[in-house]
Amino acid sequence: MSATALFTRRSVSTSNPELRPIPGPKPLPLLGNLFDFDFDNLTKSLGELGKIHGPIYSITFGASTEIMVTSREIAQELCDETRFCKLPGGALDVMKAVVGDGLFTAETSNPKWAIAHRIITPLFGAMRIRGMFDDMKDICEQMCLRWARFGPDEPLNVCDNMTKLTLDTIALCTIDYRFNSFYRENGAAHPFAEAVVDVMTESFDQSNLPDFVNNYVRFRAMAKFKRQAAELRRQTEELIAARRQNPVDRDDLLNAMLSAKDPKTGEGLSPESIVDNLLTFLIAGHETTSSLLSFCFYYLLENPHVLRRVQQEVDTVVGSDTITVDHLSSMPYLEAVLRETLRLRDPGPGFYVKPLKDEVVAGKYAVNKDQPLFIVFDSVHRDQSTYGADADEFRPERMLKDGFDKLPPCAWKPFGNGVRACVGRPFAMQQAILAVAMVLHKFDLVKDESYTLKYHVTMTVRPVGFTMKVRLRQGQRATDLAMGLHRGHSQEASAAASPSRASLKRLSSDVNGDDTDHKSQIAVLYASNSGSCEALAYRLAAEATERGFGIRAVDVVNNAIDRIPVGSPVILITASYNGEPADDAQEFVPWLKSLESGRLNGVKFAVFGNGHRDWANTLFAVPRLIDSELARCGAERVSLMGVSDTCDSSDPFSDFERWIDEKLFPELETPHGPGGVKNGDRAVPRQELQVSLGQPPRITMRKGYVRAIVTEARSLSSPGVPEKRHLELLLPKDFNYKAGDHVYILPRNSPRDVVRALSYFGLGEDTLITIRNTARKLSLGLPLDTPITATDLLGAYVELGRTASLKNLWTLVDAAGHGSRAALLSLTEPERFRAEVQDRHVSILDLLERFPDIDLSLSCFLPMLAQIRPRAYSFSSAPDWKPGHATLTYTVVDFATPATQGINGSSKSKAVGDGTAVVQRQGLASSYLSSLGPGTSLYVSLHRASPYFCLQKSTSLPVIMVGAGTGLAPFRAFLQERRMAAEGAKQRFGPALLFFGCRGPRLDSLYSVELEAYETIGLVQVRRAYSRDPSAQDAQGCKYVTDRLGKCRDEVARLWMDGAQVLVCGGKKMANDVLEVLGPMLLEIDQKRGETTAKTVVEWRARLDKSRYVEEVYV
C-alpha cells in the first residue's frame, strides 16, 4: 500500500488560519502506525480508521506519511487531472523490479508510458475485443468441461479456477500462447501463475514494511523475489523470441508491440518496453479479473434470489443455443451483478494520486506537491451519502443502467481514473460476462454452507478458502456437455413417419361405414387421463399400417357410444383411476352396461388395460369390465385382454408391443398390403419418408391447449433434498379453473437430450426437416409435409428419454454391425433386458451412443419413439387469489440408476460412496418446468378434479387435510379460497386441521410463512412432521404425518364426530399409510356411534359417503 523508502514526511504550512491539520492516529517512533490496522483485513481497517478520524486522515510508516481518503466527495476532487495525477506508488513501485516501466507502473510523464499507451490502447477497442470472443470461449469451455468431469461432489477452489481461466485467456487472446492450466497434472497451477502470485504478495509486503526489515530481516524473501522477477522476465523474453522466429499473421497485442509505431512520434517500442508491457498485461490482465469472478460467485451464492434472476436472464437470452458474442450485450442484470461486485469488492484496494503542486483539499487541508494520497475503494464505494443506508449490502438493481448512469462522479472507480484508467476494461468485462453466463447456463451452483468470507489483500483482493460445488443442469452428463459445445452442422436427413393426427378419421355415426373391406381395417379407441393410452393408440395405428392394415378411426372411447364399428376389429386401450373410468370413457362405461345382451353382435374387439399395482383392489378394473361387458353384449373377442403394470419396474410400451406381436396380430387377418409385414415378423421401420429442408413452422398438434406465460419461478427448498419449486403462470382470459383442479402441461425434452440426438444424427439446431407420407403410414403425432426445425422435432414431439422397449432392441440388433450385434442380442434375453435396460431406464439414444456401428437413420429412429404426452399437476392456488394467474408446486424428479455395464461408460456415469457407478436420470416434465423462467411460455390444458376433492359447501363443517411434500399444493389452494371467503363473512367457519410432512423446517417446509399467517388468524392449525428433524419443536418428535396423526388421535376423532371431511394428497404409499392409521380409528368411531355396520376398513370405505374421505394420489 505504501512506498516507505520513496516518500518522506514534508512540513505542511498551516499559517493560513482557515487550514486545519489532517487528522490521524498518533504514530509510534520508527514503526509509525503499523499496529493501527490489520494487514489480513486491510481495506476494512482503513475504512474503520476513516470512521474514527474522518474522510481524510494521515498514517505514518517509519519516516513516510501517506494520506487516506474514504469519501466520494473528496475522491472526486482528487480525480481532477488538472490538479492531481496517478502515482504508481506502494506495491506498484516495488513491482517495477518485475515489470519495469509498463503501463501500470510507469509515471505519466515517462515518454515510454506515453508511446506504449498510444500504441496499445487501440488494441482494446470494442470491435477488437469482440474478435477475441472465440478464444475467450475456448478457455471457458475447458474449465466447464473440467468441472463437469469432476462431477457434482467435487469442491472447487474458486480462486484457483478463476486464476487458471483468466491467465490462459489473456495469454491466448493477446499472444496466442496456451498455458494449458486446466490440463496440468493434479490440477497444479502453472509455475508462471505461481510466480505471479508470489511476486505480487511480496511487493505488497515490502511496500508496507520499513527498509531495514526488508533488507536485514526478510533477506531470504527478498532473494526469492529477485529470482522470481528474473524468471518471469526470462519466460516473457522467450515468448517474444519465439514469435520473432515464427511470425504469425494475427492482429494481436504481441504483433502490435513488435511492429506498430507511435502515431505521434513515429517510434516503436524498445525491446525492453515490449517485455515490460507484455509482462504487465499477463499479470494485471488475469489477477484482477480472477478476483472479480471469485467474488461474483461468492455473492451469487450468498444471495440466491440474485442467482436465480441471473440464471433466468441467461436462460432467456441464450436458450438452448451455445453462447455467442451477441448474447453478451443482452444481459443487463448480469452486468449489474458484476458492477455491484466491483463496488463492494474491487480487485484493487485503491489507487494513489499526487498533487501537481501544493494543494488545499476539501477546502481546509493543505497537501504538498508529490504528497501520496490513497483513495480507499472499499470506503468510497460504500459511501452512504451516495448509496444510502444499505451501501454495505449486495443489491445489483442499483447498478442497472438507469441507476448506474445517475451515479455522481467518482462513486464507482474500479478501473481507475482518466488517462490512467485501465485500458483492458472492455476485455475484462467481456470475459467476466462470458464466464458467469456460461457457468450459469451449464451448471447449478452449490454453496459451501460452512464457509465464512475471508479475504487476503495484496496488490489485489481475493477471497481465501472459498469453494463451491457445481451440478450440471437439465440432467446433463459431461459427455453431453462436450457434444453440446461442439455439435455438428446441418445435413440432409430422411425420416419415417405417417399422416398427422389431423388426417386421422373420427368414428362415423354409420357403424357399417362405406364399402371398404372392413377386414383390412381396424379402429382404435383410447381413454386416458395421463396420455399413456393415447400414446399406445397411435403406436398401434402406426404398427398396424406397417403390417398392411388401414385405419378406420383413432378416437376416444366416449365417441363410440352408438357407433362402435361393425366388421372392423375394434381395439380399446384404457385404464382405471381409483376404480373409475378415465375421463374419455366415463360416458361410455354406463352406456355399455345399459345395453341388452346381443346388442353388439357383429362387433369384433380386443382390450388392452393399463394399471398400477399400488391400486391393487382396482387394478385393471375398468378394462376388465369393458372386456366382459362387450362379450356380454354379443361382441366377439379376437384376442385375450392384454395388460401393463405401469409401476416403476415395468414399461407399458414393452408390454404393449409384446401383446400386439404375440396375441393381437396373430389373431387378425393381415392383408399384407404394399409394404406390409407378415404375422410373426418383427416390424422393422424402413426409410419410406422423404425429408427435405424448408422454413421452420410453429405447429400445435393438440386441441384444448392454450399458451400460458411464466411470471415467477423460484426454488422452495434448500440444497440436500429433492428440489421443490414454485411456478406462477399468467393464464389466458377464458381459462377458468377451481381450487383443486389439475392442469396438463406439454413438456419438452431436455436440451441435453436434444443435443445428444442432434449430435448423433449430425443435425444442426436449425436444420429444417420435412416429413412426407410416402407409404400412407400413420404417425406418432409427427407433423407431416411441413418444414420443422430439428430442435423442435426432437424437442417437442417424441420422448427421447423413454426406456427402450424389447421391440426397439430387436430393431437395433437388425441394424447393428458385427461388432455390436452379440452384445445387443444378449440384452434381449428376458432377465437381462429387465435388469439392465428396463430397470435402469436405458433409452434408445443411450444404446445408439454406446454402439456406434448401429446403422440407424432418422427415418427409422422416429417411429421407434413414443410421442410426448401431457403431464398433470395440481394447481396450488385459488383462482381469485390473484385473478388471471395460477401457481404450480412440484418436485424436480432427479434420481440415480446403476450404470449398465457396456452401455453407460465412465464418461456418462459417476461413482457414489460405495464405488457403485450410477447414471443420473431426470423426470421429463419436472425438468422442463424447472428450466422455465419469467417471460417464457408453455402450453397448458385444464383438467377438472374429482367432484369430491374439494371443500364442502357447508363452511361450518370441519376439514382435515393430510399432505406430504408437494402434496400440499391443493391444500394451499383450498386455504387461499377459505381465506378469501372468510373476509367479511358472517357465518362461522369450522375448524381446519392440516397435517403436513416434509424433511425439515429449513429444508423444504413449503410456504411456511404463508401457513403461519393463516394460523395466526385462526384459519387453520398446522400439525407438522419432519423426517430429518423430528426433534424440531413444532414436529413434537414426529417423523411422518402418520406419526403426527397418531399423536393427534383425540383431536382427529373429535373433528370426525363433528362431521369433518378428510382430504389426503400425496404418493400412493403415503396415502395407504394414512389410511392404515385413520381407517381403523374412524371405523371404530362410526361403529360406536351406530353410523356403520361395516366390519372392515375396506367395507367401511365402500359404504362411506364419497365426499367424507377423499384421496388425491399421484404416482
From Swiss-Prot:
Pathway: Mycotoxin biosynthesis. It comes from Gibberella moniliformis (strain M3125 / FGSC 7600) (Maize ear and stalk rot fungus). Binds 1 FAD. Binds 1 FMN. Residues 522-664 form the Flavodoxin-like domain. GO terms for molecular function: aromatase activity; flavin adenine dinucleotide binding; FMN binding; heme binding; iron ion binding; NADPH-hemoprotein reductase activity. Residues 1-16 have a biased composition (Polar residues). Keywords: Coiled coil, Electron transport, FAD, Flavoprotein, FMN, Heme, Iron, Metal-binding, Monooxygenase, Multifunctional enzyme, NADP, Oxidoreductase, Transport. The gene is FUM6. Heme binds at residue 422. Bifunctional cytochrome P450/NADPH--P450 reductase; part of the gene cluster that mediates the biosynthesis of fumonisins B1 (FB1), B2 (FB2), B3 (FB3), and B4 (FB4), which are carcinogenic mycotoxins. The biosynthesis starts with the FUM1-catalyzed carbon chain assembly from one molecule of acetyl-CoA, eight molecules of malonyl-CoA, and two molecules of methionine (in S-adenosyl form). FMN binds at residue 618. Residues 219-246 form a coiled coil. The record marks 288 as: Important for catalytic activity. InterPro entries: Bifunctional_P450_P450_red, CysJ-like_FAD-binding, Cyt_P450, Cyt_P450_CS, Cyt_P450_E_grp-I, Cyt_P450_sf, FAD-bd_FR_type, Flavodoxin/NO_synth. In the N-terminal section; belongs to the cytochrome P450 family. PANTHER family: BIFUNCTIONAL CYTOCHROME P450_NADPH--P450 REDUCTASE, NITRIC OXIDE SYNTHASE-RELATED. It is an enzyme of class 1 (oxidoreductase). Its cofactor is FAD; FMN; heme. This is Bifunctional cytochrome P450/NADPH--P450 reductase.
